[in-house]
Every structure is written in C-alpha cells, then in structure tokens.
Amino acid sequence: TATTAKIITLAGNPNPPSLVALYGGSLGDRKTTLSDLENDLYAAGLSVIDFNSRRFLSENDLSQPLIQQIVTELKSNQDTTGATADLVNRINESAPATISTHLTSENRIELIHQFDSSLKKLAAISLQKKPLVIIVQGLERTPTGSFISISEFIANYLNIHKFMFVVSIGEEILQNELTSSNSQMSPDGFLEDVFSAIVTFDEIAVD
C-alpha cells in the first residue's frame, strides 16, 4: 500500500528516522499495513523485530521486554564473542535503571550512561549497514498510558543510530491517553514533539 511504501522509503534513508508513528486509520488498517511492511522489509533483507505489546500484558512496564527483544536480535546478528557477551551483560545489568525510582540520582546517571554506551556499541557491531526496524503494535489492548510511556521511553533511551521504531496507534486511543494524563497537548502536538516522522493513511508529514 501507499502507507507501507512511505515507511519503506524512510527505512531506506542513509540516516533513517528513529521513531515513526503509524497514526490513525482503523485497527484493521494498521494491522494490514504492519503485516505488509514486515514482509516487504524482510524481502529487502532488513532485520525486523515484531514487538507485540499484547504478549506482555502481565508486565507493568513494556520497556524492559522491548530492550530484551532488541538485545536478543542484535546478539543473533553477530557471532557471539567475549566482547559481545560482555556488552550484553552490561546492558542487562543497567537496563532496569532506566525506569528505576529508588536509585540515587548519581547511581542512576552512571547506570544509564553504561546502558547507553553498551547498547550503542552492540548496535554498531551488529548493524553494519542496514537498519534494524522495530515494529511496536498491540497497544490498543494495554493499560491506558502505555502508548505515551513507551513512546517517550524510546525517544529518551533508544534513540540509537540504525534503530528505526514504528509505533502504531489510533487517534481515539491517543486522545484518551492524553486526556487521562491531564495533558494539555493535542494528539498532533504530542506526536510532533516525541516522534521524528508521522505516517498517516492519507499523507505523510516529516519534520
């Protein structure tokens, strides 16, 4: 479809946008587009992760399973060496700090720095030329607030060269999340603030 083609074009950029919203349309539209997108990306020889939030409904936070899936994919792209294993250990050790509320700020800053530098190194080793596309879907079924929190988490902690996240969300759900979080932002305002590109079902807006 035209919508799929827009996202494929973004993935083909030398410097793909790190966070793309697939916004609007019906749930069926979004599911079909993501399924086509996944097939087309595989056909183009890209690495793709399909992160389906519905599998993690029992988790109180989606960021940690998302990190684990990314690390597993990066590891599998690479013959595991001592250096790779060490980076994976360092990521696993420091990832919980990204959402921790009980660490001292000094400890947290140190661990977040470790997380950031280790994940960047692992990505650089594993993703030589082609980007890794991570599709995040199923947020329609997760607790209210999940879309905003995972989007902000990706923007803050996973903005890494060669990672391209595609997060799918409907208009009504985003409006509900913003209303329930007492945010004064409009859905468009939120998307423009947090995402690097927004793909809708009739046109494309890229800042």
Give residue ranges: language-model regions.
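Walker A/P-loop-proximal flanking segment of P-loop NTPase domains
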Residues: T1-R55, Q64, K75, L122, ...
